[in-house]
Structures are given as structure tokens and as C-alpha cells.
Amino acid sequence: GDGGYLMLHSEMITSLQEKKKITILLFNNHGFQCIHNLQREHGSDGFGNEFRYRDETTGRLTGEYLPLDFAAHAASLGAKSYKAHTAEQLKDALLKAKNETTTVLIEISVLPGSGTDGYESWWNVGVPEVSVSEKVTAASERRKQRLAEIHII
């Protein structure tokens, strides 16, 4: 996604440097949404995982999303880039990418919070057992119950 790209876009530079074409599908959901969801699942309201402006009234990072243009960034590094806001645009971008001879980035717009469920998977992350937040202590109790259900063979 866009969060991972911000940490690892240097891999694209390596592909350009070595003239080894790769096609990058960048799902832009305005932040580290899987971590944001994990925070909320554990009783937090979330902090710092969405690319938002600070709200001038509250002082919190709950303002408008930053207008980051990852396709323009990739192009500035020398890659070919496309944006896809619809399924048809994505199909068109994929066909164009297939015919390119250099690295391609396709920025795909995704609505925040529209990810899939965990499909019975579980990310065992520590949760404080003591907190002034009832949501956090409830999340801690859910974690304890889940751990009690695990049977290791």
C-alpha cells in the first residue's frame, strides 16, 4: 500500500538503476490502514497511521487526508505511472503496463476502512491489562480468551 511504498520506494529506484522492469500496484488507502484497524481492535482510537492534516480545532490528526500523489512521485524518479480510480481504469493501466519496457507504478484508489476481514486469522499483539479506557481493558479480556482457546500440538 501507500504506507509501505513510503518506506520502500528505494526498491523501485534499484529496478530503474538496474534496468529490471517491475510493475508496482500501489493501493492508496491514505495510510497504514491495517495498523490503524489493529489499533482500533485493541481499544485505541488510533494514532498516526493515517496521512491526515492536524485538525486546528482539536489538535488531533483527524483533518483532511494529505493530497499525496504517488504516481507523480514515481514518475519523478523515472518510472512510468498511471492512476486508477475505477475498475476500467485499472484494466487499462494494467494493459499499458504490460507493454512498457521500464518500471511501472499503478496508483489504485481504495477507500479507507474497506479492507477484508481477517478470515479467522489473528494477530497476537499485547494489550495493556490495566487502563483507564474501558475499550482497552475489554480488548485485553478478549485477547486472554482467545489465547485460552489456542491448542498447540
Predicted segments with their positions:
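Thiamine diphosphate
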Residues: 1-153
